[in-house]
Amino acid sequence: THDFMRF
């Protein structure tokens, strides 16, 4: 969902 988390 988040680009930095990649979920």
Curated annotation (Swiss-Prot):
It is found in: Secreted. One of its GO terms (biological process) is neuropeptide signaling pathway. It comes from the Eukaryota. The keyword Ribosomal protein does not apply. The keyword Transit peptide does not apply. Belongs to the FARP (FMRFamide related peptide) family. The modification Phenylalanine amide is found at residue 7. GO terms for cellular component: extracellular region. Keywords: Amidation, Neuropeptide, Secreted. This is FMRFamide-15. It comes from Sarcophaga bullata. Transmembrane segments: none annotated.
